[in-house]
Amino acid sequence: MIKKLMPASTPSLPLWVSTNATSLSRRVGILTTLALIVVLSCSTKSFAQDQPTIAKDSVQVTAFTLSSYKGDFKIFSWVPRLHLRVNGPIASGSQIYAEFTVPGGGAWKFDCKTQETGAGHWWQPDECGGRDALGEDKGITYTGPVNFTIKMRNELMGGDVTLFTGKFKVAKIHSNETGPNYVNHFVYYVDQDWNLPIGYVFLEPDDVYQWKKPTLSFAFWARTELNGPFEPHLFHGGKEVGKMMYEGEESGKAGCGMNEIEDNPTHGTEPHGQFIWTRMRCSFPNIKAWNQTGEGNQTMFGSLYLLSENPGDYEIKILYKGHLVRSIKFGVDADGKITDNRIATNNKLGNNRVIVPVQVLGDADGQWDKNAWKTDAFYGNPLAGFTGPP
């Protein structure tokens, strides 16, 4: 009998080939069984290891107020609504879905639109849940803590995994309607105060030169109905920087022109505007991280301010209606990059933003819970390594 050592498809399982027919049959049967076990094991591990992640800063849970409760239009009720962003890979056949539970047995379960997405990319459905997905008959009048999970099932691969587990508090306030028929018209909302001390500083590609001359930008939260612009100012070494003047007026003025997220009640409330949380994105057009275009920094209105030429500590001060309402501090390295504190990376946010503490000043936001970020941040998933402002 002659034996030969042959390479196998699974390196950890060397294959001995025998010229004896009986022995050969026995060995092939054993190896086939072992190979099947390995394949199934690898498939299960692959599904678990290659699963997507939920970007924490994208998850927004709101209460969608319904105009009836069990067919009674004199009573309002609510159902959950969810926004999220999923970092790939999302395998073919995957389905993202969410489950919400309340004490006493109330529950909702609904799918989120899902698309196959490669690693290094992300998928963001418009929204999940709400009235359109759940219907008027699924509303409840409960207020208090609610638990939820975001999961992914894949019937092609035979797996079901939990991607995110969270909790939040639902409260209610009376609508702006008056009269005996509206006594039980309560508008429901999710308390989002934990957002206020958490901000983001980042670079964005220039409209023309892209990453050869990126712009300094940031995002922050406010709790108020916006009745005027927020005015950001950047300071370095105690002096304001990035200002250009032309014929007595500022050119390239910094501003907060885009609302990234708006958490608004679905109905009007009294007092009005008290339960509106908004995340705004702001930018400094005259402030660039670096200039690798081969062109100079001089413009017809003045010279661009480069972070790469001015590393160190910076502070963003924000005015609202003439009053100082925010202070955001961050650092810049010698290359002009935002000093990375690794909070965003370690918490798998999946973007290039640096998370920074935001000091809330004044009373423009009304009364809010200054300690909510410690326990309620990202719906019971506080950021590892983050410390709020004093």
Provide a role label for each language-model segment.
Residues T44-A48:
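Sec/Tat signal peptide C-region and signal peptidase I cleavage site
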Residues I2-T33:
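Bacterial N-terminal signal peptides that target proteins for export
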Residues K169-Y189, A334-R353:
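Low-complexity, Pro/Ser/Thr- and charge-rich linker/hinge segments at domain boundaries
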Residues Q49-T162, Y188-I318, R326-I328, A334, ...:
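Contiguous segments within soluble domain cores/interaction surfaces
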Residues L31-S41:
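Bacterial N-terminal signal peptides
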